[in-house]
Amino acid sequence: MSRIIMLIPLDKDIGLTSIGLSIIYFFYQKKIKKKSVQSILYFSCTQNSSNSTSHVINKYFSKIVHTVDYIDFSKVLFNSPEYSFLLNKVIDEHYNNKFLRELILIEGIKNNYCINSEEMNYDISQNLNAEVIFIANLENSSPEYIKNKEKKINFFLKQKKYKNILGVIFNQINSPFLENKYDFIKKLIVLKKIKNETKTIVPKKILKNNFFSIIACIPWNRNIVTTRVIDLFNFLNIQHTNLVQKKNHIIEEIIIFDTHHLNLLNKHSLNTLVIVSFSRVDVFLNVLNCNVNRSKVKCIILTGILKLKKNIASLYKFLIKRSISIFFTEKNTIEILSQLQNFNFDISVKDITYIKKLQRYISNFFCHSSFMFFKKKYNINVIYPPKEFCYNLKLLSQKKNKRIKLPESYEIRILKSVAICSDSNIAQCVLLGDPKKIYSIANDNGINLKKNIEIIDPISVRQEYLARFLEIRKGKNINEFSAKKQLEDNTVLATLILESNHVDGLVSGSINTTSDTIRPALQIIKTNPQSLLVSSIFFMLLPNQVLIYGDCAININPTAEELAVIAIQSADSAKMFGIEPRIAMLSYSTGCSGFGCQVEKVKEATSIIKNRRSDLIIDGPIQYDAAVSNKVAKLKAPSSPISGSANVFIFPDLNSGNIAYKAVQRSSRIVSIGPMLQGLRKPVNDLSRGASVEDIIYTIALTSIQSE
């Protein structure tokens, strides 16, 4: 299985492309075991620049790195449908590649690219359960500046509560360009004056921080900052007529030829680029021909040229004879200068020699211990992100491909869900109702119900199940007349169809009460022989993890024995869906801090579970805050086996459970899937009457996975 790392920018000018390329180089050289074709997957969350990392990879490293180029979060709003669509695409890529690649490297969203970059970076990384590397810069290495930088990063990390943090890379240390006080021309002047190759190296010990690890401190290096002729003109994307051998020459100075053209006479640079407006061509020719040491001028940009004209042919001949490269564009001088302000001095995408030099320089600051796969230390606390959970729901249900009965077939949400499930092969949905009426409702609401979706007309099949219903309800004072009356309820009929093995599961409740769904299931399907009771759980899809709440829908005031059964059922359900259960038996007190019949009930239930299922990680009685917070757990329950990381919460009664799940769901505005019923011989699941189409789809998937 691949390792997934996400690079998250904390500042604007951090050399993200340089860091990404260098991490790829480091992993391929030092940590990738199988040097197979495209053993690394890379993608950026934005596609804003022709100088992007993916552009360099596709040009020079496509044999070892596979890229994904169609994902761009910079143009969508956080939590919008477009955002959810892109996030699902990212998760698809992750799952499609996690067994094919050794490393998945994701480049996060820069702060200046998107207004919601912080929220998106957090959400993407947590839903992928990625290891996170933050990238920051340091304008200077003074103790005061470093201290302030550490405070800012600490504050940021406390706010966002990232999981799986590998550490921080400080890049561009002491770069003269971080303050953004220079325009492009002045930057060239600064580079010309700086002679030393690197700035002072900042030792890691100076940046020692208890809140985050320091992976590398990379000083700015003058020797890898270039402004070659070819890079400038590829960046400007303008035409040329005489590139000659000077394409790799370094440009040290830019001169704008205007009414103050005498500045051309006074310069002593040997590598000069001159920008000339076509309207001043004649004057420029005279100056160049008569007064200037021509070796100074390496190339010329002619601006404002709409098309090649005969009257500049002499200019071309003159310049070509003197080995001066000529470039021309329709843009005016101001537009060209404005475009040059965005030129990236730190990466040259056209020169593989330069790129490899940069990769070696930066990767020298990395070490093996900095990239230790820290999850191995914390296997017990692996978080299951909600998007990954939902993706797995669909994946598992697609593999099972079960027949799921939906009796509320005239409800628009049900029909929309069935259409999506059919298109996505999540399940074979079977509707119960008048086919003509169902198709009429679907057509009126723009729902495309494919012809392969099975629709059973209840009028035509009720008589078939009458005898079986009377047999099941024998001894309950039900005669044929009352049985026929009950079978007019489509939920009762659908439950009989399930009991007869004609379908694999049943989903109902979008327009009916919970009791309308559960009562027929208890009367007809009945409990599993291994179960004493039927209980329910909700899957609570929090922003960065999935929690299970039980029982929030069925058992009003369970005994200690019943509470133990509910907890064991919930733990087994968690495992069914890939969640390693850590169970909190909730109460209003933790450990021995409180007394009362409710506390004693929870204590007894916990003891029963430990005796029956020693394989389960469980603690109780325990308060909710001690169950979810490591800090609180250290104070209230220092020896707790769940250590503030519970993911299965068993409430002592229906009153507390139902209130809690609705409070969390509504206050946090999260998706909750359920209630999923446990303990029945066949899967029957209830929908909330306020269920969305998405909720219904996930409940159908849950039901399919529960089916044997």
Curated annotation (Swiss-Prot):
Subcellular location: Cytoplasm
Class of the enzyme per the UniProt entry, highest EC level: transferase
Chain positions covered by the region annotation Phosphate acetyltransferase: 388-708
The protein's Enzyme Commission number: 2.3.1.8
Principal cellular location given in the protein's record: cytoplasm
Gene Ontology cellular-component annotations: cytoplasm
Reaction equation(s) it catalyzes: acetyl-CoA + phosphate = acetyl phosphate + CoA
GO molecular function: phosphate acetyltransferase activity
InterPro entries, per the entry: DRTGG, P-Actrans_bac, P_AcTrfase, P_AcTrfase_dom1, P_AcTrfase_dom2, Phos_Acetyltrans/Butyryltrans, PTA_PTB, Ser_kin/Pase_Hpr-like_N_sf
Cited Pfam families: AAA_26 (PF13500), DRTGG (PF07085), PTA_PTB (PF01515)
Pathway field: Metabolic intermediate biosynthesis; acetyl-CoA biosynthesis; acetyl-CoA from acetate: step 2/2
GO biological process, one term: acetyl-CoA biosynthetic process
Keywords noted in UniProt: Acyltransferase, Cytoplasm, Transferase
Domain remark text: The N-terminal region seems to be important for proper quaternary structure. The C-terminal region contains the substrate-binding site.
Described function: Involved in acetate metabolism.
Assembly description: Homohexamer.
Entry similarity comment: In the N-terminal section; belongs to the CobB/CobQ family. In the C-terminal section; belongs to the phosphate acetyltransferase and butyryltransferase family.
PANTHER family the UniProt entry points to: PHOSPHATE ACETYLTRANSFERASE (PTHR43356:SF3)
The protein's name: Phosphate acetyltransferase
Organismal lineage: Bacteria, Pseudomonadati, Pseudomonadota, Gammaproteobacteria, Enterobacterales
Gene: pta
